[in-house]
């Protein structure tokens, strides 16, 4: 490794300067460093050296050194982007290491040299430097403000200044020195390890600074002090940044020293070190080993130019040193008093006190210092003085503990640590002066703090995470040994210190949470690392874990070594021996350091993140603290003495807030309250249900326990002191600051120790604080008791606060109860816990403890864990705490369960505590009280990461683990391409198989399949991304891959990923097992499935069944035979948001239409057996995909198919001649596949024989490779010649087209709903209309019946049974087919009703589809339009019950004509009905115009303009009998009226109907608006138009909507034969009589004409018209005009059908109508007598007519599609596979676009291909079909409803308002509709008048108004 010419020391100043954030801070840093160095060099002449250095530094800082501009780094223009500075550019203001001028680096050597000399001469200078560095570190740790500002703001500056002055460094501003030291340390860290550099909280590479070497070299006090400061700072910094590096500063400094020595030895020229540097370098084995470990983990000297994370030369040198070195000097300068004082000052200790402490420490010889093993080992390993090591360890421990105390995250943690360190440091420095402080080493202090933190009683509530445990264990050796227990505490009980430590641990945890870096600072690198790495997002959790582990380990160690030493050492101040702690730290740190070394870089990176996280954590803690009433906040206020630090401390330490509980906590509570309210709207428990009593009880119990613990743990005298001292501490500013800090730490500890630790620690702190305050010192006792002392003081304060708080718990409870009540509804869980916890903790403390015990948040039972910790720490206290806390834990969890108990949510590997549950009832205890630091309450990223579900507001989310979704496979890391672009190379997935080459794929498949050679065929396909499809957007194939021979068993399609040569360069996209199932099984399945499903199956409408325009009829048009898909097994329900059987007690996975249990069982057996047999094949061929799908089998076995273990499928879809357009199965399981079992027709089961009609499976985005798997083009051509690959050419093909776009399921559903609503309204109106009908003229008796459908029903003239129609159509069982509009309806029960989702019978099957579409459309076409549309015999109007399902008549055919309508009325009805049919047909044409409204009277047109098929379509699937027109009794108004006005009205009303439109316009005069039958045409509410309209009212409404047409055909005022023939009245009568003789349905009439070919129509029309006329008894004289007009109107009305079958319509209109007039009537008479056809009886000529009309319509619909463009572009894909009978195809349908080609003649009754698609839905992974989810959802909905109700009640809003609103809507709609009706009535104006005059009419208009209400838009 090439070292930079400048030795690290030299580089350091420069680096610091270069990297310093600003000159000022740099100057300060330099001043502090240099003075310390100079001081060190000055051999104790601190002042002189300091002055000189200060001068130099100030000069340097004042005059920024300029780059030489000639060295390589200067010439380098671009930053490397990889070094720490570059990576952390935003935070590190230093230049890229690669661009750092060599001269600047060298330049720094001068100060270093001086410093080194000084170091050798005077260690105090280093100590001083260390102090500033420590301050800097803390400052860097501090989140509140700039390090400089913080340092300046901190009283430590004064102390430092005083100390510096004492050290003769008066010229240096303490802050500047601190900054300098910090920067130096930072640089040293970075220097020692580039990664370590980040360790420096300041984010500056201070390791480069020679100060560290100075520490090493210097043994004098100044050097020791500087070293201590630097080490402490580095330790804190590294602890903060790398946590894993306990004394990262120390190791860094050691490393720097070592590296300097290394440079000195290897590159003396380049090393700027003085000769003393090398000798000064500590070379003890521990130090060397530690440096080696660091170096191995990427901690390189700053000058190292080696590439990579390690410096081989340096490593080798270290190894050699280790070999040659026996033991390094254990002496290491203790952290300088300056450091300690700085820290103390930073902690807000009085300057005088700090100085006193320093003096005392100075007086204390290092020998007197109780050194922890960690400190000793640290000193040895790092080659630093024992004092330095102690300082480092103390700082490390303190830093870990300090985070709790930090008001400013960095400062508070570091300050408490520093305080301990200061104490310790001073102790060592004093070496004899401060025995009390000395008893605990820094490590001990740190450990004690942490131990207390972790092991204190408060720790009990805080569960220890394994990480924490391990961390604590690692740290414990030192901590336990060094655990300091103030004399009071030790006297009271060893447990108390443990408690204190535990609370501190808790605090530490809090601080950890708040300050990940600080938390990491504890000596245990593992814990820090774990916390940093593992708990970045889970500071609380990590805190819990770390503290727990620590508390346990610390408890053990402390109980052994620490407690003893602590008791001995804790006499006065902290009595923690830094050496002991250091030794412990070193012992545990060897391991930790290794870990740290490994994680150091990562931690450093994390540190930057964590700094923010710490800030967030602090905020979180504050938020947590909100739980604590003002008492906690009051301490915060005290902390506020030091605005920034204290504030941070406040944030950090809930206990501190508790200690200073006055106003802020409530504020925070409010804030938190608000956020929580925001976070959780629906809490598990309503406020009313929240029981605070349990919490209070728990709190009381906890308080009692705490009090008992305090009493037990604390000496009796101490307890009073606790209370008194608490106030004292609060009183003393230093005490306050320290207490605040302590409190912060304490809070952390307290959270752990909450019950006991708080009181104990608090008492200790109070006593010590009191003594300290009295002494004028910062309450070092608590601080000195790093873990116990400081934590104790904090805990004491907390405990005191808690004790009062406990006493105040009732008050707090009241407050919290209020809060809880306020938040309970939304956060009830959290609030419940807070309430209980707060009471137990003092109310304030508990929340904070929870805050500090953030671990509680993570730990299900933080209280329990903390109890354990406390127990470990203090056997007595721990026992008490454990017992009490455990009881509380359990009580909290069980007895004091908050209404919202903690819910442990787990999703995959993530387990989250319930969001608003305040974590757990145990948390309700001290620790249980959620604190802000518990993130769940804070909307922070870390909080979210901590508990994602907590941010879910719904109880369902918190209660339930949402279905685990397997993440999409990540792209493999390969260097083949810069970026994987699936658009270019195709979708990436490997679960079917992958390999580097095609040959590897063959090997793979041969291994899987077990055969080789020809048995396996591999075809290469190329992804083009261009979809091959016909001009109409339907699937096409360009290449067909076929099975070549029987020898071929397996075929795989593989794709070469463009540009890839990696292990996944070739992936399998499709596997075809030609013989997937036995032939016999396939044959039987084909027969069984085709027979059963065809008869009883319920087709499923699929979007992929249509092209983009939704106009293709690829499935076929015949609803009985069109291709369709049928779903079985479990499938996803949008309603349940889970399996559709979520609420099914007895799921019918293989449900068929109707009640066919035998068939269902048979089908079930077939599919289950098949699934059982297919699964092994799937497993064999695609094991990974199979496994992915079978993973959750045991969990969701209810949603799986198969009879044996290994069920990869949740559902199966049977596609029968179903053409699936290109699509992806987006909802399939991630990394799963669809397995398609193909069954083909008998003529397509031979290999090598291409059937006349076949269906192919297409991959539209792929093209076939020009070479075979071996790269041979010849072989590929040979395959083509042999038929293995069929190359298709462009050719035009006849395709089916829908006249109108098919409606989507959503549209159909909406229409159905609207129709239903209208039907209901119509039914209501019908009830009223009969009376009105009665009111109508007697001559219109029969017609009058129209208005009164009930009358009609009661007096049926003609009864029609729609059921027959259905039966005729064979829709009884297969209503599905009809309903299967464009692939079937979802509701086979009523496939024919508008209500049915698929009320529109398969458009493919509907010859008159256009009409159907039109009718289906929202247009208010007359029902006839819809159902006359069924003119196609295939789909009678009844099936199209758009209007037929008229609720009013509920099947006029059944009852509508119960009262025989006059023949005229019937004729009118008939005319309208069939007229409408004809018109429907015409309507197709006219509809093309205005939707079958076009030609009618202008008014009628206007009215027609409103396509009102709403009613008709919406009508139930009611048979035609139910069709309004059918159901309706054709009602007539008085003949005179009907002839004219009524006709006009009807005409106007019906004018909308297309058929009528034309006729009306042309023949308007003849029958005016509607074919003016007095009542039947116009008046019948249920008249012919009503046929079209569900009810007469609807008819009117719809007539209005439909226009004349609906009513006109049969409703002309004049009685006209339904035939529209001018038949004399007598004839009409005869016709009527004839018609009446036979039950007939106008629908049928309409059906037949529309459906039948012209000839058929002619025939039917004549016969039927006659029959109609016959049926129509009152033959009002039919005007030929009317008839003609009717014919015309028929045309018009037919127009709608005309769209679908224009020709038939035209013929009917022309021929039929022409022929119909009189001859038709005659023929009608004859035919009617013979062929009185029932529109429902599909038999009468209907079949013929249907077939003919269907054929004609199909012919008309068929168009030619050309795919030539696909073949012109060779890159357009279209690779198809011709699946054979019994073959199994496996593909990733989720990722690959796939399709199936349409069949020429689809016939699902005898399907060409049955595709059984087995799949697994991605989310069907819940047991019992996801019933729990559903129930949770229902609960959630109920809760929401409850909340809404409560809100409504609060607002005084009545829930009825909504219904009123709806009514208003309806009313408004009705009102709106009414005007539209009037508009429709433009021609219907008369109708409107009639409405006014005629009750019937009025009813209609009203009904119209109501019905149209929301549907006014249809008008």
UniProtKB/Swiss-Prot annotation:
Compositionally biased residues, Low complexity: 779-793
Zinc finger residue ranges, CXXC-type: 61-102
EC number: 1.14.11.80
GO terms assigned for molecular function: 5-methylcytosine dioxygenase activity; methyl-CpG binding; RNA polymerase II cis-regulatory region sequence-specific DNA binding; zinc ion binding
Subcellular location: Nucleus; Chromosome
Chain positions covered by the region annotation Disordered: 28-49, 629-679, 776-806, 831-880, 1298-1356, 1469-1516, 1719-1753
This protein's encoding gene: tet3-b
Protein name: Methylcytosine dioxygenase tet3-B
